[in-house]
Design a protein with these regions (language model features):
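N-terminal glycine-rich phosphate-binding loop and ensuing alpha1 helix
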Residues: 1-44, 51-53, 92
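A C-terminal functional module that forms or caps the active site or interfaces directly
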Residues: 205-238
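Hydrophobic packing residues within well-ordered alpha-helices of enzyme cores
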Residues: 39-43, 111, 204, 261
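Conserved core of the sugar-phosphate nucleotidyltransferase
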Residues: 105-194, 198
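Short beta-strand-to-loop acidic/aromatic patch adjacent to the donor-nucleotide binding site
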Residues: 92-102
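A structural signal for short hydrophobic beta-strand segments in well-ordered beta-sheet cores
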Residues: 1, 146-149, 242
Length: 279
């Protein structure tokens, strides 16, 4: 956890601070078991008295009955496997985020408002989409899940790689045929901020079994959130409302992103968006 703020704050510190002031009431961390002692002493302790926290563990051998991790597999099973690890700790509507992405206050506010809405059916989910122009790295190209939507609901997420600035300042990516294609700056993309209700765990467990049947012996295969969401949408089992945010994403994708991020956090503190001491 790299300290990037003026007083050594991590990106996760900002996310948790924004979540608290947006109305979230608990944080569940998904970590490796061998990281537990350091995590509890160096990271968790600072949140004490600010918000309830729980820790769950992701490991390669956390598999359904009838499956065992192939010898030599070291790669985690993916983002949706990490979500599944939280099943016993989560009993209410919840948001999923990456610990190393800065999402911004507005993102948590729109997510909290949507998750607070009464629901009368299963599969009523949401996600926050960023404008791709607000997610670029000055250090190089990025990969993003481009969101295709209909009437405000997600139709599909298509992973696009090699997204960067062209010589004329426009945004482009490399398609599956190796050709450069333009992306409008306001194109919505997923930064892995999803909003689910607990029925998502039930479908995910069943889908994980099917994933393992096909991929158990593939050492690099991963069980990703967008894959499961796409399955549920295509099967008519879920709708995913696409929420928009005015926030600008940033993170340390490349080493030369770090000074840029440090400067941005300094500006946010100087402007009063964040207090001198958050925790």
């Amino acid at each position: 956890m790299d300290g990037l703020g003026p007083h050594g704050e991590t990106i996760m510190d900002y996310s948790i601070y924004d979540a608290i002031r947006s109305g979230f009431g608990k944080v569940v961390f998904v970590i490796r078991k061998d990281f537990e002692d350091d995590f509890r002493s160096k990271i968790l302790s600072k949140y004490q008295g600010h918000i309830p926290v729980e820790v769950v563990f992701q490991s390669t051998d956390a598999l359904p009955k009838g499956f065992s991790c192939p010898e030599g597999r070291t790669k985690p099973w993916g983002t949706n496997h990490a979500v599944l690890m939280g099943k016993d700790a989560i009993k209410e509507p919840f948001a999923v985020i990456n610990a190393d992405d800065f999402y911004g206050r507005n993102t948590f506010e729109v997510m909290a408002a949507e998750l607070s809405r009464p629901r009368d059916r299963k599969g009523d989910y949401c996600m926050v989409a960023f404008y791709v122009g607000n997610t670029m790295s000055e250090g190089g190209t990025v990969s993003r899940g481009v969101c295709h939507e209909k009437n405000g609901f997600l139709d599909t997420v298509v992973e696009r790689t090699d997204i960067g600035y062209a010589a004329d300042g426009t945004i482009e990516f490399t398609d599956e045929n190796g050709n450069k294609q333009k992306l409008a700056p306001e194109t919505p993309v997923s930064m892995n901020m999803w909003g689910f209700t607990t029925d998502y765990f039930d479908y995910s467990e069943k889908a994980f079994v099917e994933f393992l049947k096909e991929n158990i012996d593939k050492p690099k295969a991963e069980y990703f959130i967008p894959s499961v969401v796409n399955q549920m949408i295509n099967s008519g089992l879920a709708t995913v409302r696409v929420l928009k945010t005015s926030s600008k994403w940033f993170g340390v994708t490349y080493a030369n992103d770090r000074p840029v991020v440090v400067a941005k956090f300094a500006e946010l503190h100087a402007s009063g968006e964040y207090p001198e001491k958050m925790f």
